[in-house]
Amino acid sequence: MSLERATLWSILGAYLLLPASTVVDFPAFPPLDKVTISNVSAFFVCRFILGKRIKLLPNLGIGKILILIYITSPFMTAFLNPEPIIAGARFIKGMEYYDALSAIIRQSLFILPFILGFTFIRDSKTHEELLWVLAYAGLFYSLPMLFEVRFSPQLHTWVYGFFPHNFGQQMRGGGFRPVVFIGHGLLVAFFAMSSLVAVSTLWKLRKPIKGYSAGIISLYLGGVLILCKSFASLIYASLLVGLIQLASPKRQILVAKVLVLLVIFYPMLRAADWFPINNIYSIAAEFSEDRAQSLKFRLDNEEILLTHVRNKALFGWGSWGRNRVYDMESGKDLSVTDGRWIIVMGEYGWVGFLAEFCLLALPVIRSTKVIRYVKDRRERVVFGAITLLLAISIVDLLPNASVSPWTWLLAGALLGRIEQIKFRAKVRTTNLHTEFIDNER
């Protein structure tokens, strides 16, 4: 197995198979879970066992700046939050330099797949390999998913001895959402959607999968996705598969860019009270009153948390639950934090939010400038599909809280590919210029 393929499988395999909500907490070190352990293991093997040189920073200047801010901003958060929070009987200690160091280490561990991505998964061959890994992983994982759809989410309990989340949240429409080992049915549905998009791209490339048409397998994975009972993932799949099959890669990338810009500007519009909440609620109510009420509950909680963020807007409130809102008399937690964006903004403020989300969005935004240099049709199809997958992963961070190692790997891989395309275009231009001068002589 090649290094690139092993890197892809190690990050994705750990996400799919290791237990969710399991943490090993060492003193003076951030908690270790399946995300951080797999990230460190993959990095350690590549660097110290295989002896591969790993670039810690991309060539792109803005990328370097965003990484450094992402890693170091918790120091300022801790420095500006020394006071405790007292609400009724609840006491939350002030931030200390130990907390800053722990957060900086945690941020560094989270970003390791991004670094591995732009170091190793950076050419057309490895990008197509990425799609194959997603396709095979989706087919493999569909079996336990279908089992849990039929018999309820039991595998995590049987294998690891506990259930990682609220069981009631996995009950939908008289049946069950599969959970397997990822931790929540919505995350499983998003993975199924990603696998469907990968197989659909292989179908576009006319690549059979083990002798079977990728189109037939797309229909199968589409059926599995429907059984996951996630409306959002169905919308994502419909949009991405439709774009991949019907739109040019250039248009796909344009749509991806618009999506990530909307994600970045959404908190700004909410903070400025320019987001049309009432109009969106009215539209949702026309389709389903239950979904409209759920949306209103989510938006109301975001408003409560945004009001709290305004008191420490730049660098946030820090960890230990300081970003949440409590009743000052009873100490009761009044917060429901669903979206990743509001969690990051509450903990690390606007600086932390912009560092994380702009770093994830940077490859998508830059891709519009390099697609014209990709001449091969197959490479353009793959480039467009991966850009769309990354964009929709960023969009999903608005309603959901989990940014997976796979999302960071996608972002790093796309940034590495962009750097390679720009380098080759520069070399080609230099060679043409040299030939022109030689001919003139």
Predicted regions and their residues:
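N-terminal hydrophobic segments of proteins, predominantly signal-anchor/transmembrane helices
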Residues: L3-F26, T36-S108, S393, E440-R441
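Interfacial loop-to-transmembrane-helix boundary motif in multi-pass membrane proteins
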Residues: T7, P58-Y70, Q107-S108, L116-F147
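Alpha-helical transmembrane segments of multi-pass inner-membrane proteins
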Residues: L112, L131-L155, V159-Y160, Q170-A247
